[in-house]
Design a protein with these regions (language model features):
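Alpha-helical transmembrane segments and their juxtamembrane interfaces
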Residues: 14, 29-30, 53
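N-terminal secretory/targeting leader peptides
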Residues: 23-26, 38-127, 139-338
Length: 338
């Protein structure tokens, strides 16, 4: 073989190798680019102040998603009420302004009146996911709010009436009470004059005497400083707080199976932990309130029973009035047989 022929063969092999290498690099680049393109970042907001009782479970959920979802899905947490007023969260989620929301049914009744029914649940979420209650509500969320109800992160957390004036019976005549839709029907039935404000305005309302009291769960008043302006808590508690993670359905439908799996895993963990976590939180804040000088008003047995009965009676009447189509059916799922 001549030297020229050998040179040509060698050069041909080198060119072929270079072409294969270039193709390999191109394929690798395409694969990497494709993998990176699959990661999606969702915008999230909370209806409650950051790092407070009713946002902490959501923030733990976000941390889990961002840890497990690297390269797959991430959540950009834009904040709480300073980023978006609580009563605007439902519509923002529905229209896709945000992809994920941590909110409560009381703040989304302007979009879906049935969402307030969660407060009346007498069964844990584990049971509602089996008896059809969750599925029934999930269908309404999809239809009315364009939302996926992912998980309930607050449960087993009773509401109470807090006052700055003592009462001896379940009668709020002459008192101005701050409310959200949670308590409106109940407190009005007890004779109260009701005033609706976002949580961020309650402290000032108490300080200035705009209201004489408010409804709120057993936990969380220390986060907001309300204990400084509160003298009494009325027992027994009633209803149960609900704070849940919702996902815009249009966004959800575009996610891959792997992305949905990351969200579902974090959501299921959070929901499974909620009951035990709030049992501990309830006990801790009950003691903390006593230590802070908040006195307990306790009705006698008959008055206490009447108080709770009226709470649920007026609560369900309100839900059924707002949603004749679904209210009675939701009650079947949520209530315990008497």
């Amino acid at each position: 073989m001549t030297n020229d022929r050998a040179f040509e063969l060698g050069r041909g092999r080198i060119v072929t190798m270079c072409k294969k290498l270039a193709l390999g690099l191109a394929a690798a680049t395409l694969i990497c680019s494709s993998a990176l393109a699959q990661e999606v970042t969702l915008r999230a907001v909370s209806a409650f102040a950051e790092k407070t009782t009713y946002s902490r479970g959501f923030e733990k959920f976000i941390d889990r998603v961002n840890a497990d979802g690297k390269g797959v899905i991430q959540i950009n947490y834009i904040g709480g009420p300073k980023a978006m007023p609580p009563f605007e969260v439902g519509n923002a989620l529905k229209t896709g302004v945000v992809d994920i929301a941590n909110t409560t049914g009381a703040f989304t009744t302007n979009v879906m009146p049935e969402s307030d029914a969660w407060k009346l649940t007498e069964r844990p979420m584990s049971e509602l996911r089996k008896n059809g209650g969750y599925d029934y509500m999930a269908t309404i969320y999809a239809q009315k709010m364009n939302a996926i109800f992912l998980a309930r992160l607050v449960d087993n957390n009773p509401f109470h009436l807090y006052l700055n004036k003592p009462i001896t019976a379940p009668d709020l005549t002459g008192l101005k009470i701050r409310i959200t839709p949670v308590y409106r029907d109940f407190f009005q039935a007890l004779g109260a004059t009701v005033v609706q404000t976002p949580p961020g305005e309650v402290y000032t309302s108490l300080e200035r005497g705009v209201v004489d009291g408010y409804g709120w769960p057993i936990t969380g008043i220390f986060d907001l400083g309300w204990h400084e302006k509160t003298k009494y808590r009325v027992d027994p508690g009633f209803y149960t707080a609900e704070v849940s993670v919702l996902v815009n359905k249009t966004t959800w439908d575009k996610l891959s199976a792997a992305q949905k799996a990351v969200l579902n895993k974090a959501a299921q963990l959070g929901e499974s932990e909620a009951t035990a976590e709030f049992s501990a939180e309830n006990a801790k804040d009950t003691k903390r309130q006593a230590d802070a000088g908040i006195q307990t008003i306790k009705f006698d047995a008959a008055a206490a029973e009447s108080f709770r009965t009226k709470a649920y009676q007026t609560g369900w009447e309100g839900i059924i009035k707002q949603s004749p189509e679904h209210g009675a059916k939701i009650r079947e799922f949520f209530s315990k047989a008497k």
